[in-house]
Amino acid sequence: MKKIVAMIPARLGSKRIPKKNIRLLNNKPLVQYCLEAAVKADCFDEIYLNSESEELSSIAEKCGIKFYKRPEHLSSDDSTNDHFALDFLENVDADVLVQILPTSPFITSEEINLFAKDMVDNDYDTLISVCDNQIECLYNNEPINFDKTNITPRSQDLEPVKSYACSLMAWTKDSYVENYKKYDAAYHGANGKIGTFTLKGYSTVDRRASCR
């Protein structure tokens, strides 16, 4: 059996929205919503809150999960998801890592379970949560999913264009470490079998000012 570990990354510092991860939403710290959803899901062997700040450890304890103290040098604005996920995987025993962003407070335990199941059942190396955008989309001012020489299509007839939701990401430890060593980056999967998992409705709401 593969060991599946959940990680919720939550820096205390943020330049655009200071202490956003512990700001209250309906009288509850923002980060607590996804922690509770992760606990309610029944797919994880361990759940960690990953932060540089001990201030968040009390929230982890309250939710009955583990706290991982991120090194200070990985808590700056210059550090990326690639960096702190690698640090976590190098120090925590896991076969599969599922990352849940605290800035997605409406993610549900049911979606988390389905996401983790999809990752394992399909033997993905990387699984990315996405939104389907069923609207006319452009890239470099050129149409992606419609013909500009034809009449305006009905939205329901358009081929959906996928964009990152970021709320949920998953990687196998082996593929993540291998990609990082080869490319100095691993967040997007690089090599290996990559899948997408579509989120809908409020689960795609993201309160990020940064992805950490």
Residue positions per predicted region:
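N-terminal nucleotide-binding beta1-loop-alpha1 segment
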Residues: M1-P18
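Short, high-confidence coil segments that cap the C-terminus of an alpha-helix
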Residues: F44, A94, D123-Y124
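Active-site acidic Asp-centered loop
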Residues: I100-P102
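Hydrophobic helical membrane-anchoring modules
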Residues: G189-N191, G195-R212
